[in-house]
From Swiss-Prot:
It comes from Saccharomyces cerevisiae (strain ATCC 204508 / S288c). Its main location: cytoplasm. Belongs to the protein kinase superfamily. Ser/Thr protein kinase family. PANTHER family: MAP/MICROTUBULE AFFINITY-REGULATING KINASE, PAS DOMAIN-CONTAINING SERINE_THREONINE-PROTEIN KINASE. Present with 2220 molecules/cell in log phase SD medium. The gene is PSK2. The active site is at D975. Residues 841-1099 form the Protein kinase domain. Coiled coil: none annotated. This is Serine/threonine-protein kinase PSK2. Serine/threonine-protein kinase involved in the control of sugar metabolism and translation. Phosphorylates UGP1, which is required for normal glycogen and beta-(1,6)-glucan synthesis. This phosphorylation shifts glucose partitioning toward cell wall glucan synthesis at the expense of glycogen synthesis. Also phosphorylates the glycogen synthase GSY2 and the translation factors CAF20, TIF11 and SRO9. PROSITE patterns: PROTEIN_KINASE_DOM (PS50011), PROTEIN_KINASE_ST (PS00108).
């Protein structure tokens, strides 16, 4: 919601926080255990506060990001952009203005928040805590701001816009809606193709926005969008009652009466930081983190890993324990990693790596010219309980090798494998050359002979060492080349000045026989957390790796300094804000949760310079590198409390980021003779030995050949097949933009649903699509209501047959329609697996995308039935998860387990309707869940803020029922989390995603699944696990998350030994708390079984 903006002078500004102001943006997850660091702090902090604040930026692998499409980087910015677009799309006023000529922009604007707003339906709707309420000091595009009505978000949910309303949509709104649709897809799916484009849009200026409307309208639309991005907003950590907290005294009185917003100093910091920092992040669609647990001593042998570690590094579970940490590190960085580990051990430091970027080893990582590419990853690692827990995440990184002559240190050659300098040279040539000439204005890499043409500061250091201006002890005993190399390695961080802007880089030097090799690498995107004292602007804590990579400053050089050492203008900007917009003072207690966006600071800077138009072309603020050069950064500020603010500082290059997320194919490992058995073994009557068996290696080789030839039968030949051609073909479709399926997506997409003739069904699908794009609408009361009677009929065994009968009758009714939802599995599943094709279907809705595949809502072109199709990349199917089924053939275990569960179905488990395959994918057909679609439990928790305990009980009871059925069949799910539970509008639950499921007799297991959030302590501790107790632990995490809307544990320390905390303000029953405590016990043998949980008194309904 945006309040009316007045033209009153700043002195007339009044402010009232009379609604719960909740934003949509989410900075990174932060952890709260203390470690030694900075000693200089403001006296406003207690010792406990200080230690916790020091620990936060380095204790968490989410307090930094070098990955522009990770949730804690792209999401931070795109959610702000989405919030702005939603306001514009749903505001007729803004769109009406776009029909007129662009008005002269009133600038600088002023702000007044009225206290006595009329109580209207619009105002009431705006108080929904799901709506991102905005403060609007900088919106300046409307000609009559004082008379502009309050902006409201759309409140119609089940009713779609009628034709008359739809006909009034102007081109500007259509463009905004398309952009909003792309944003939602990127945020929902972490799609590289969309996110890499939107990455730059999220840091956009007016030159980076392209709309199809005429120039005048487009210019106005761009400015409206940029202005909306510059609006501050609130993101509260708790729901406030709907009352006016108009003054500081009123706020203090309220604070005394309500312990849920008490100040940081009044409660235990550990507990408070857990709560305060929770809303800053979302674990959903988190980046593909490879997690390893290894021994703490040399040679650091691996004890356990997650599935994404196997996928990222191209290894199988059978070889994990034969590898060491250094085996995964590229030879160029092994000494660096070794030194860091040894130093941490000598200094008894728990945190070993805080996000250092290093090259890693990955099979088949070659460029188009068959030149080996370096694959880069950030590394976070912590020593705990005799173990070293490591988290890798791939990052984009440009690098060049510069070879210097040993005589005069001139440049002999530059190896630019990633075309780093070439791309920038082309850009500069385009910018500085007229269209009529092709005259080259810059040098290409092979024409550079002076290192000063690449980096002034690097060149200066080399010259200073050569001429004795920089000298260290023992230098006189060393040859000049080694002295130069040592000093460059010691300094390490410089800026590159050969490009359109100064950019930070890191340099590693080695002396070869005839030359010096400089390996220069630069991160296109880097961002990290800096915690600052609100009163003095001194740095309280910061991520050490980001400080070095971005600004070239180490801990001892930055500790206790002012933030102006990094962003010189920030103090003046804060002072200007306090004077001009006093209601935005970051030290006011009522401003806890205030967010000042990147574009807000860009606009403030333009206002301070009295140059209104410079905001629209701004590319950020000036940051200061250690070498004295200025770099461009963006700053987002969040008020933690009256004493501290969080700064999320970003440096991002305006370049097209190459797809760095490619994963090595799993197929080459099929040639490994040491693999005796791959896949699952039957373990119950429901999955008897007749249905599955061991797979010998030669059969797997034949299977790989089959995936290309589409043969009807599996070869029994023992001849070894050449997989090079297979791998090359599959590598083309391995990650990111997949050629074949992208083509299908484009050609087979039916946005108008011309194939759906039935009006009622078409209306339901339209609602499904709408709710997919805006999950908050799905949980509104006129659509979402937990139906207890219906749910009880499902989960009570007595009525199982009755439900099946009702389902069959529904199928019969639907079969009379021209287009229908298919819910009955094929009689012979997989019988047409090489006949049926994906081109037989048309995509109605793109639903999701993950590390292993994609999900689409589709309609069959000929038979007109509607299903959800999950597409699994064959290349990414872990080699350990193939099974040979006598009836179904050689298939992924996910399909085999789903087919097994079909034989003895349970209503809370998603059915397999059919499957088929082609060269690149397996396609799994499943029913559409819910008449108006469904959303996952993560989104229900996120958006359904008013869910009561009884509703949570009904939802959780169904999840327990589904897991009970799995365990009864001798199957463990191994990836229980809120994202793998879908819920329809009646609260009807389905458990999904059996890609990690396995038969219990296949254990014990060494590879765990997913991220740390749901991992049991014994798993993170490196122990092999049986499966059932770990499913139980994940259920406990899930129950806590449903009830308290946050994770029970925030880091490794808490999972391994932290104490459970329960927020008393939530008024949760003792029976529920008791069940959570029973489940989340660290002693494996004392955890309850699924039957005991199912019979628990709290779950008695």
């Amino acid at each position: 919601m945006t309040y009316p903006v007045s033209a009153a002078a700043p002195a007339d500004i009044s402010y009232s926080k009379n609604t719960p102001l909740v934003g949509l943006s989410k900075p990174p997850c932060l952890y709260q255990h203390a470690s030694s660091s900075v000693d200089s702090f403001s006296s406003t902090f207690s010792d406990d506060d200080r230690s916790d604040l020091v620990a936060v930026p380095n204790e968490s692998p989410h307090a930094f990001s070098y990955n522009p499409i990770s949730p804690n980087s792209l999401g931070v910015r795109l959610t702000i952009l989405r919030r702005s677009l939603e306001i514009m799309v749903n505001s007729p006023d803004i769109l009406h203005e776009l029909k007129k000529k662009a008005p002269v922009i009133a600038y600088p604007p002023s702000l007044r928040h009225t206290r006595n707003l009329t109580e209207t339906a619009t105002l009431s709707a705006s108080r929904d805590p799901l709506n991102g309420s905005l403060i609007s000091p900088l919106v300046s595009n409307m000609p009559s701001p004082a008379s502009r009505p309050v902006i409201q978000r759309a409140t119609s949910l089940m009713v779609l816009p009628d034709n008359d309303t739809a006909s009034k949509l102007n081109p500007a709104k259509s463009e905004l809606e398309n952009l909003l649709f792309l944003l939602n897809l990127a945020l929902e799916n972490n799609s590289f193709e969309r996110a890499s484009d939107l990455h730059m849009l999220s840091l956009l200026n007016i030159k980076k926005i392209n709309f199809d409307s005429d120039i005048q309208k487009s210019e106005t639309l761009k400015k409206v969008l940029l202005d909306s991005l510059a609006e501050p907003f609130f993101e509260n950590y708790k729901k406030f009652p709907h009352k006016d907290l108009g003054s500081k005294s009123q706020y203090n009185e309220y604070e005394e009466k309500h312990d849920d917003i008490v100040s940081l100093a009044d409660i235990k910091p550990q507990q408070d930081y857990s709560r305060i920092l929770h809303p800053f992040t979302s674990a959903k669609n988190s980046g593909p983190e490879a997690i390893f647990t290894c021994s703490q001593q040399y040679p650091w042998n691996f004890k356990a890993a997650n599935d994404l570690a196997c996928l990222t590094f191209g290894i199988s579970k059978n070889v994990i324990k034969a590898l060491t940490l250094l085996d995964l590190i590229h030879t160029d960085s092994r000494n660096f990693v070794l030194e860091k580990i040894m130093n941490a051990e000598d200094d008894n430091q728990e945190i070993v790596f805080t996000g250092e970027t290093i090259p890693i080893v990955q099979p088949n990582s070659t460029s188009n010219n068959n030149v080996p590419n370096l694959i880069w990853a950030s590394l976070w690692a912590k020593r705990k309980n005799g173990l070293l827990v490591c988290v890798f995440e791939k990052t984009p990184c440009d690098y060049i090798d510069v070879m210097l002559n040993l005589r005069d240190f001139s440049v002999d050659s530059i190896i630019d494998t990633t075309h780093f300098l070439e791309n920038f040279d082309k850009k500069k040539q385009q910018e500085s050359t007229s269209p009529m000439t092709e005259k080259k204005t810059v040098k290409f890499a092979n024409e550079i002979h002076d290192i000063g043409s690449v980096s002034h500061s690097l060149s200066k250091l080399i010259d200073d060492v050569r001429f004795g201006k920089v000298f260290s002890a023992d230098d006189d005993l060393l040859p000049l080349s080694i002295r130069v190399a040592n000093h460059v390695n010691e300094e390490r961080y410089f800026t590159l000045n050969c490009l359109s802007e100064n950019i930070p880089c890191a340099v590693t030097t080695s002396v070869l026989e005839n030359e010096i090799k400089l390996k220069i690498h630069s991160l296109p995107y880097q961002a990290g957390l800096f915690i600052v004292d609100s009163h003095t602007l001194s740095l309280l804590s910061f991520n050490k790796s980001v400080a070095k990579n971005m600004f070239g400053l180490r801990l001892h050089e930055l500790a206790g300094s002012s933030v102006t050492k990094l962003v010189p203008s920030l103090a003046d900007m804060i002072s200007y804000i306090n004077k001009t917009y006093p209601m935005l003072n970051i030290t006011l207690p009522e401003n806890k949760g205030l967010v000042l966006t990147e574009h807000f600071f860009r606009k403030i800077e333009a206002e301070m310079h009295h140059d209104k138009d410079s905001f629209y072309t701004s590319i950020g603020l000036d940051g200061c590198h250690k070498d004295g050069n200025l770099i461009k950064v963006d700053v987002q500020l969040r008020v933690l409390n009256t004493n501290a603010v969080l700064l999320w500082i970003t440096h991002s290059r305006d370049v097209v980021i190459e797809n760095y997320t490619t994963v090595p194919s799993q197929l080459p490992m099929l040639k490994e003779n040491e693999i005796d058995v791959v896949g699952s073994r039957g373990s119950s009557s429901a999955s008897s030995k007749k249905s599955s068996e061991k797979i010998p290696v030669n059969t797997l080789k034949a299977m790989a050949d089959l995936s290309i030839s589409s043969a009807e039968t599996i070869s029994n030949s023992d001849d070894e097949v050449d997989l090079n051609q297979v791998n090359e073909k599959l590598r083309e479709t391995s990650c990111g933009k997949v050629r074949g399926i992208e083509s299908n997506d484009n050609n087979n997409y039916d946005d108008d649903m011309t194939m759906v003739d039935d009006p009622e069904l078409k209306h339901k699908i339209e609602l499904t699509k709408m709710y997919t794009q805006d999950k908050s609408k799905f949980v509104k009361d006129d659509n979402f209501k937990v139906d207890e009677k219906f749910i009880m009929r499902i989960i009570e065994p007595i009525n199982g047959e009755e439900i099946k009968k009702e389902t069959n009758e529904l199928d019969k009714r639907n079969s009379t329609l021209k287009a229908t939802y298919l819910t009955t599995p094929e009689a012979n599943i997989g019988s047409q697996k090489r006949i049926k094709k994906f081109s037989d279907f048309t995509i109605l809705q793109v639903m999701g995308e993950g590390a292993y595949g994609k999900v689409n809502l589709c309609i069959h072109n000929r038979e007109h039935y509607i299903v959800v199709i999950k597409m699994i990349f064959k290349e990414r199917i872990l080699v350990d998860t193939w099974v040979r089924d006598r009836k179904l053939g050689t298939i992924p275990s996910e399909i085999q387990i789903m087919a097994t569960l079909n034989k003895n179905s349970q209503e809370n488990i998603l059915k397999l309707l059919d499957f088929f395959e082609d060269d690149d994918y397996y396609y799994i057909e499943t029913p559409v869940h819910g008449e108006t679609g469904s959303i996952d439990l993560f989104d229900v928790i996120e958006f359904k803020k008013d869910m009561v305990e009884h509703e949570a009980k009904l939802v959780f009871k169904q999840v327990v029922a589904s897991i009970k059925h799995l365990h009864d069949q001798g199957i463990v799910h191994r990836d229980i989390k809120d994202e793998n539970v879908i819920v329809d509008s009646h609260g009807f639950v389905k458990l999904i995603d059996f890609g990690s499921a396995a038969y219990i007799k296949s254990g014990p297991f060494d590879v765990f699944v997913g991220t740390m959030d749901y991992a049991a302590p014994e798993v993170l501790g490196g122990s092999s696990y049986k499966g059932k107790p770990q499913d139980i632990w994940a259920l406990g995490v899930l129950l806590y998350t449903i009830i308290y809307k946050e994770n029970p544990y925030y880091n490794i320390d808490e999972i391994l030994e932290g104490e459970l905390r329960f927020d008393k303000s939530e008024h949760v029953s003792e029976e529920c708390i008791s069940l959570i405590k029973r489940i989340l016990t660290r002693e494996v043998d004392k955890r309850p079984t699924i039957d005991e949980i199912y019979e628990d008194k709290w779950l008695k309904i």
